[in-house]
Curated annotation (Swiss-Prot):
It catalyses: GTP + H2O = GDP + phosphate + H(+). SUPFAM superfamilies: EF-G C-terminal domain-like (SSF54980), P-loop containing nucleoside triphosphate hydrolases (SSF52540), Translation proteins (SSF50447). GO terms for molecular function: GTP binding; GTPase activity; ribosome binding; translation elongation factor activity. The lineage of its organism: Bacteria, Bacillati, Bacillota, Clostridia, Eubacteriales. HAMAP family: LepA. It is found in: Cell membrane. This is Elongation factor 4. The gene is lepA. CDD domains: EF4_II, EF4_III, LepA, lepA_C. Its EC number is 3.6.5.n1. InterPro entries: EF-4, EFG_III/V, EFG_V-like, EFTu-like_2, G_TR_CS, LepA_C_sf, LepA_CTD, LepA_IV. One of its GO terms (biological process) is positive regulation of translation. Required for accurate and efficient protein synthesis under certain stress conditions. May act as a fidelity factor of the translation reaction, by catalyzing a one-codon backward translocation of tRNAs on improperly translocated ribosomes. Back-translocation proceeds from a post-translocation (POST) complex to a pre-translocation (PRE) complex, thus giving elongation factor G a second chance to translocate the tRNAs correctly. Binds to ribosomes in a GTP-dependent manner.
Length: 602
């Protein structure tokens, strides 16, 4: 049974596809409950990063506490936990959902259900959350709320007959949403006297207090001055401050009880000690079992990041260290490349995560960066029977020592208007996708399921998908495991020397076409020198493509007016000798544009 205090608490999150109005609805709820005055309002209050506002996406989970006086006369405490919507941050989403009892599902009245709406709904159902649908953007001329209601019922199986119809932008019917939360979202039920178990769903670094951890107390009570233990990392800390969350700040309190959402500060120095999903308990009266669902987040996509100016190496390390304070999913280790000098091999959750980190380095820390082609983790079985994981093509053992190679596979869900289904099938086959399933959501839209290699998605699959469907397709993927594949390492040689930063791993069927395109692209972007430069693509020792950047030539015959042919020949031979010598000692400068052009091959 919930205690008297718990009856008036509602913990919920808002889930939606990108651009369906999740952050705008959160803004309106804050305004209506008086947490913020309209003067303090700025768009997307919970998206703290400038980048989040600009791209219109939520990257870090946030939480806020509101007090709402309902029509039944009671005051309710609403804890809204804002979740990232993008597939890269899937684990963060699942932990945020685990901190709630219910979820508001926001669906755009003009667009209907999209791929990530579905992915997040399934996650919410796995956590047994009560889902409350809300139909947004009903003020748009193209809105079809009744059609969307039917879609919610058919595709997800939720009863949408009572769903509030709102316009978050204009603040229409927001009151109805606040009232519905009381009825539809269950209150927490937990024992305040049991041993403490609290779930970490986010953490960030504060330069004065150290790491501040966002928690949801599942059982028990936590007070200032308690000594806590993190059940997975086994670290112990003394709680110096705890309290509730409000936009743009913290409001300290004396204790947090079962059902509460709040924060704690405990002089923690490193974000890596407070892993998202870990369980906090008390040292004096520890819980027997941690909360279920914790897993260590592993990087999926890797790339080399190098400063364009080699002397900035130390600064780049500092910047990455700072970013890592708030982003435990970012990993990096030093690496050096013959072509690019010293830099770092960085690991990310996915493509969006990689782009965001690169953009933040360039924008917040003013770096000029050179990045290598993104790569995934391959599993290589050697002829001795050892299994090694490779995230950098330059570390691949010689062909003679490899018995087999496996690559990570994903299950891709693509939602698309029916007239583009053919285009998507072509694209998926080009990317070595294996067709699994297809179903129709309504007359105009289909849902396709494919199994694909992650390697084929990380380059520019998303761009290709959008361009072939005029921007209408939406896409979501999840990892399904590893699969053996015929993969080879493609090397690029300039002037007879391998450029390590341009090597990558590719499927054998595609290797020749890829090698040719790379050679052509490089020929366009490498400036001419005084000697000719052969550009060769090779697999093992076999050359599969070649292009030549022609040399500049001085006209050595300009002084010869007529005269003997052998005199001219002597001068030309002499020039040829000089070019040959130059070629032996000359090194080729590869401009940054050349690296970038090779990444954008298709």
């Amino acid at each position: 049974m919930p205690s008297e205090r718990q009856k008036y608490i509602r913990n919920f999150c808002i889930i939606a596809h990108i651009d369906h109005g999740k952050s705008t609805l959160a803004d309106r709820l804050l305004e209506k409950t008086g947490v913020l005055t309209s003067r303090e309002m700025q768009e997307q209050v919970l998206d703290n990063m400038e980048l989040e506002r600009e791209r219109g996406i939520t990257i870090k989970a946030q939480a806020v506490r509101m007090v709402y006086k309902a029509s039944d006369g009671h005051e309710y405490i609403y804890n809204l936990i804002d979740t990232p919507g993008h597939v890269d941050f899937n684990y963060e989403v699942s932990r945020s959902l685990a901190a709630c009892e219910g979820a508001i599902l926001v669906v755009d009245a003009a667009q209907g259900i999209e791929a990530q709406t579905l992915a997040n709904v399934y996650l919410a159902l796995e956590h047994n959350l009560e889902i409350m649908p809300v139909i947004n953007k009903i003020d748009l001329p193209s809105a079809q709320p009744e059609v969307v209601k039917k879609e919610i019922e058919d595709v997800i199986g939720l009863d949408a007959s009572q769903a509030p119809m709102i316009s978050a932008k204009n603040g229409l019917n927001i009151e109805e949403v606040l009232e519905k939360i009381v009825d539809m979202i269950p209150c927490p039920e937990a024992d305040e006297k049991a041993p403490l178990r609290a779930l970490i769903f986010d953490s960030f670094y504060d330069s004065y207090k150290g790491v501040i951890v966002y928690i949801r107390v599942k059982e028990g009570t936590l007070k200032t001055g308690d000594t806590i233990r993190l059940m997975y990392t086994k670290k112990e800390f003394l709680v110096t401050e705890l309290g509730y969350l409000k936009p743009g700040g913290l409001s300290p309190a004396d204790e947090l009880k079962a059902g509460d959402v709040g924060y704690i500060a405990a002089s923690i120095k490193n974000v890596r000690d407070t892993r998202v999903g870990d369980t906090i308990t008390l040292v004096e009266n520890p819980a027997k079992e941690p909360l279920p669902g914790y897993k260590k987040v592993n990087s999926m996509v890797f790339c080399g990041i190098y400063p364009a100016d080699g002397s900035k190496y130390g600064d780049l390390r500092d910047a990455l260290d700072r970013l890592q304070l708030n982003d435990a999913a970012l990993t990096f280790e030093p690496e050096s490349s013959v072509a690019l000098g010293f830099g770092f091999r960085c690991g990310f959750l996915g493509l969006l995560h990689m782009e965001i980190i690169q953009e933040r380095l360039e924008r917040e820390y003013n770096f000029d960066l050179v990045t290598t082609a993104p790569s995934v983790i391959y599993r290589v079985t050697t002829t001795d029977g050892d299994v090694i994981e490779i995230d950098n093509p330059t570390n691949l053992p010689p062909v003679t020592e490899i018995d087999s190679m496996e690559e990570p596979m994903v299950k891709a869900t693509i939602m698309v208007p029916t007239e583009y289904v053919g285009n998507i099938m072509d694209l998926s086959q080009e990317r070595r996708g294996i067709y699994k399933d297809m179903s129709y959501i309504d007359e105009g839209r289909a849902m396709l399921t494919y199994e694909m290699p992650l390697n084929e998605i990380i380059y520019d699959f998303f761009d290709a998908l959008k361009s072939r469907t005029k921007g209408y397709a939406s896409f979501d993927y999840e990892l399904v495991g590893y699969k053996e594949s015929d993969l080879v390492k493609l090397d690029i040689m300039l002037n007879g020397e391998i450029v390590d930063a341009l090597s990558f791993i590719v499927h054998r069927e595609k290797s020749v076409a890829r090698g040719r395109r790379m050679a052509e692209k490089l020929k366009e972007s490498i400036p001419r020198q005084m000697f000719e430069i052969p550009i060769q693509a090779c697999i093992g020792g076999k050359i599969i493509a070649r292009e030549t950047v022609k040399a500049f030539r001085k006209d050595v015959l300009s002084k010869c007016y007529g005269g003997d042919i052998s005199r001219k020949r002597k001068l030309l031979e002499k020039q040829k000798e000089g070019k040959k010598r130059m070629r032996q000692v000359g090194s080729v400068e590869v401009p940054q544009e050349a690296f970038m052009s090779v990444l954008k091959l298709d």
